[in-house]
Amino acid sequence: MSGAGNKRAAGEPGPSAPPEKKAGVEDSGTTVETIKLGGVSSTEELDIRTLQTKNRKLAEMLDQRQAIEDELREHIEKLERRQATDDASLLIINRYWNQFDENIRIILKRFDLDQGLGDLLSERKALVVPEPEPDSDSNQERKDERERGEGLEPAFSFLATLASSTSEEIESQLQERVESSRRAVAQIVTMYDKLQEKVDVLSHKLNSGDISLMEEAVLELNSYLSHENGRLQELADTLQEKHRIMSQEFSKLQEKVETAESRVSVLETMIDDLQWNIDKIRKREQRLNRHLADVLERVNSKGYKVYGAGSSLYGGTITINARKFEEMNAELEENKELAGNRLNELEELRHDLQEVTTQNEKLKVELRRAVEEAVKETPEYRCMQSQFSVLYNESLQLKAHLDEARTLLHGTRTTHQRQVELIERDEVSLHKKLRTEVMQLEDTLAQVRKEYEMLRIEFEQTLAANEQAGPINREMRHLISSLQNHNHQLKGEVLRYKRKLREAQSDLSKIRSRSGSALLQSQSSTEDTKEEPPEIKQEPDDPSSQVSAPRAASEEASEVKARRDEEERERERREREREREKEKEKEREREKEKEKEKEREREKQKQKESEKERESKEKEKGKHEDGRKKEAEVIKQLKAELKKAQESQKEMKLLLDMYRSAPKEQRDKVQLMAAEKKAKAELEELRQRVKELEDKEKKESKKMADEDALRKIRAVEEQIEYLQKKLAMAKQEEEALLSEMDVTGQAFEDMQEQNIRLMQQLREKDDANFKLMSERIKSNQIHKLLKEEKEELADQVLTLKTQVDAQLQVVRKLEEKEHLLQSSIGTGEKELGLRTQALEMNKRKAMDAAQLADDLKTQLELAQKKLHDFQDEIVESRVTREKEMFNFKRAEEDISRLRRKLETTKKPDMVPNCDEILMEEIKDYKARLTCPCCNMRKKDAVLTKCFHVFCFECVKTRYDTRQRKCPKCNAAFGANDFHRIYIG
């Protein structure tokens, strides 16, 4: 135990070590220490002290050696790790290099036509370096691993050669291997060149126009491909075989690796346990060495001496009796005998444990490797063998059926592939048609888009033009309506002037007829006047007809407008127009009533005039001059009215020029132009008549010098007065008409607002129409697309019909095959019936055999139960016997020890004195107070679970080393289950 070394003694000396020892431990090594032995009485004591110092020095040297061994061990572990990493890297390089060589070999086998399989395998063996003899420990370990697994031979052989050879040999071997790899790559390049040449030759032959060369090339290519196919098949077989072997080897190696890992884990645990035991033993040895040194120093310091006889206490010395020393020696011998017995018992137990472990391992191996003969002799194996034979025959039959089914399946596959090819062709053709149709549709769509863009641009232009022409048209309509109203007013005035002219002409004719008997000049004038009135009467007929014509035209235009307005306007506006028309009709009726009243007044005035004429005849002479003045005034008034008419005519011309410059699109403009032309003609006729009347008046004024002329002048003056009255009435009517014009202007403004609303409605309708047109175009496009889809679906339906017909034919063929298969199934069912009968017979036999087997199994289970019971009883009896033997031995030892004590107590002359008795008691008490685990320290800790007392250090070490059980009763304890106690 002392040769194992002690770490703690060198680094951490015990608390009871003296300072002299500490100095010696610190200075041990290079310096030579002087040792003080103290007072020595004899040579024996000197030898003892020198031996003690030598022992101490040797212990220190052992500690140093142990530290050096630990450092060297760590260095060795580092080197081993480094060597393992180097070996692993070399293994990886070698493995990938071998894989590279293997790939090159497979490529050469794949493409090299002249190379055989045997040559290839020989080449593979040539690439492997031969295995050298192991020289080092690492190589020896690798050899052991190679003996375990044969799959790792090439890699480890290469590493073994590298480990056993020198640097020059390593370089030469690596150069050889590199050269071999380079040669293999060069072979691949040459092989590729050959293949390229062959391909070029064949392509040249095939591309040449000569049929014979092409046939030769095809035959050569066919033979080459068939040969290549055979080679590839052979290569695939070899590779499959190799893969199978490698997979088996891999599984074996994996199992070995698992077992090795489990063994390594077990060994690691064993190493940890042994290391812990070694540390424990070293600590114990250190404690004993310290204790021994302390005892020796105490003995030397206090001066204990041994004398041969007597036991008396001298000053500073204690005498020990020789008898006591002999007793101690006897006890020591007894303890040695007990220790020997214990060692023998431990060796027997260890031997038994080894035998049990070997038997256990043998049984495990036997369980893993069951005997084949024993298995074959079992009835279960025989039943399974018979079932296997039956199943094997059935499998052969099923294999035959499977071959037939495969042939059928191959036929159906070929037919299916043909059908698929036909369908694909149809699909390709349909795709082409669809693409062409899509292209056409895209072209048409592009054209339609262009047309749509053109129409949109035109529509925008027309909208812009309409927006620009809208206000102009409104202004023109406003002007036209105002001019129409003005023309109507002028027409009314013209009619009034015509009436006045007619009345004046009628009055003049009456005057001329009355004054015809007086003078010849008056006769001639009366004749002229008699001839003129019919002309004058005839002339107004023309303008009345002319006036009636524009009235009819204007009525027609108003009716057309009313119809349009009635169609466009809403019901509310129609009601308003109706109300306005009713008001206009009421105004017309009022005008008619006024005209009737005026005619009545005229009749009354004519009667009054006739009465006045009688009176005026008497007064004509006196008033002739006054009449001339009045006629001149009337003529002036007529001339002023003529000027006004001419001015209005000029305004009408300007308006006509404006109308002519405006676009002639509406009917209202045409009607206005026609009305204007008629009004111009009427004005020219009126001017001519006015001129004729002036000439006639001048002639009459020259002729009328007599009394008749004076009378006529008076009558004319009266007529002028009457006309002035009428003129006042006309002015009143004109004012009424102006008020009516204001009313009509307001109505016209209302109409304009209505027209604006109608224009907005028209725009909205145009927008709606535009939207409807775009929707219609879209719907037409969708309709076209739907038509095309319909045609495509019709084509698809036709193709599907053809496919259905083809599938119906296939179904018919399959039905025929089904009939054949049903017939074969019928025959098979008959055979199956026969076989089922045979199987039922075999089942009955098997049932009988199974019943017998069950009976035998029950008997065997009963026997096995009895055997297990007997074995358990034997084991229990053996255990009890061993316990009894152990207790018997312990009892014998106790009896012998107690017998010795009794003998010592019985001897009277051996009776010790009081001091010895006290010393024995003190020893007994000290033994009771010392810890039973270490036998060194005092008891100062208690376990609260079982209340056994030990030293605190032992309990703490047990807790730290996870041996958390009581040394006496094996009761488990935790961190809070022990604490210190103090015994006085």
Curated annotation (Swiss-Prot):
Subunit-structure text: Component of the RNF20/40 complex (also known as BRE1 complex).
Gene that encodes the chain: RNF20
Alphabetical UniProt keywords: Chromatin regulator, Coiled coil, Metal-binding, Nucleus, Transferase, Ubl conjugation pathway, Zinc, Zinc-finger
InterPro entries reported in the protein's UniProt record: E3_ubiquit_lig_Bre1, Znf_C3HC4_RING-type, Znf_RING, Znf_RING/FYVE/PHD, Znf_RING_CS
UniProt source species: Gallus gallus (Chicken)
Name by which UniProt lists this protein: E3 ubiquitin-protein ligase BRE1A
GO CC terms: HULC complex; nucleus
Chief site of localization: nucleus
Localisation per UniProt entry: Nucleus
Lineage of the organism: Eukaryota, Metazoa, Chordata, Craniata, Vertebrata
Zinc finger (RING-type): 931-970
